[in-house]
């Protein structure tokens, strides 16, 4: 629940309220509330502004996940799939794109400007297995580079996960993280 709340917005609301309270208290000569409003309100407001400026919004599920896939996720999803899903569906601060460290480590875009941008997230069933599908906008990194790194991605995302890469549209890459039957046995 808390992962869906923007700390920047909370800071702006609380800081704005306290700062406004400080100005009103100053106008009515209430020194105690005036000090509280200024000493706490202005820093919280500035902190909220700073967080809002560096905020990376959660990636939406498009379309929303059906209940059958949610129960499949609970049964078959690997720890890595769950971690990726949880990381990209919450607010992040101080980074330019979701999964930036993972993409850099895998060699998909060396500079921040080259890193693909994650657009949407889907969960579905593929051949009875849970699949987490990430759709990237990848204008700087062609499909060939993604395909060269496919084996490295399979190792990176851990045992029990098969990686499939497909180009949907020009500059649009679909990365599917699919559980394998080894996950059920192991």
Residue ranges and their predicted role:
Residues 1-70:
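N-terminal alpha-helical membrane-insertion module
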Residues 33, 109-112, 159:
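A general structural signal for well-ordered secondary-structure junctions
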Residues 60-90:
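Cytosolic juxtamembrane segments of membrane proteins
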Residues 66-75, 93-130:
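An N-terminal amphipathic alpha-helical segment
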Residues 84-94, 129-134:
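Short low-complexity stretches enriched in small and charged residues
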Residues 90-97, 138-144:
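Short, surface-exposed ligand-recognition loops at beta-strand->loop->(often short) alpha-helix junctions
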Residues 122-186:
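Cytosol-/stroma-facing membrane-proximal "stalk/adaptor" domains immediately downstream
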């Amino acid at each position: 629940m808390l992962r869906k709340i923007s700390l920047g917005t909370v800071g702006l609301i609380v800081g704005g309220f306290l700062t406004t309270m400080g100005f009103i208290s100053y106008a009515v000569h209430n020194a105690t509330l005036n000090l509280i409003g200024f000493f706490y309100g202005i820093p919280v407001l500035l902190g909220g502004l700073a967080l809002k400026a560096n905020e990376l919004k959660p990636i939406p599920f498009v379309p929303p996940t059906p209940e059958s896939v949610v129960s499949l996720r609970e049964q078959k999803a690997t720890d890595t799939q769950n971690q990726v899903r949880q990381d990209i569906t919450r607010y992040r601060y101080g980074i330019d794109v979701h999964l930036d460290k993972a993409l850099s480590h895998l060699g998909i875009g060396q500079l921040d400007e080259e890193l693909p941008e994650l657009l949407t997230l889907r969960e579905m069933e593929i051949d009875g297995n849970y699949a987490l599908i990430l759709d990237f906008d990848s204008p700087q990194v062609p499909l060939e580079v993604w395909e060269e790194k496919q084996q490295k991605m399979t190792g990176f995302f851990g045992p029990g996960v098969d990686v499939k890469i497909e180009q949907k549209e020009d500059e649009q890459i679909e990365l599917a993280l699919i559980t394998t039957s080894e996950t059920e046995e192991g």
